[in-house]
Amino acid sequence: AFRGDTFGVWKQGPMSFDELFAEWDICGLTQAALLPLDLTTSAGGWVVTNEQVEQLCRLHPDKFIGFASVDPHRPDAPEVLERAFREQGLRGLKLDPASQRFYPADPIAEPLYRLCEEYGRPVIFHAGLSWEPGALSKYSHPLAFEEVALHHPALRMCLAHFAWPWAR
């Protein structure tokens, strides 16, 4: 499978939703964001697809908040994201510049940022060091996001992982 062969990520052991949500109850969790990853151009596939996230969110809309992912290098990237927001009901965008190999301020991402602003949806960026094979941290250094924030003051952005190790 693509995930296992490319990233060493295998499906977790079987667990029913009832078991999962019982564990959540113990931990005081009520919801979780589901984050797919489109690596179409950098690695040849998806780690988790928008369709898989959509299906899980439809099963448990009270528990899961689904995000979309779009490889910014795809020629159809804006169309894929608009479909995710309008038709699939996904509520934000997950980008991983290190794995998707783009600088956050690269013009290829501009149409995606504009769509997020238009729909009022947040962007979660993987920021900082990545342990994934082939991921280049130069694309996810925290300073790389400054220009995006400057040019898109209305864009809601989250830098995941606090951009470790470039944090104090």
Model feature map: region roles:
Residues R91-G92, F102-R168:
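Catalytic pocket-lining loop regions of alpha/beta-barrel enzymes
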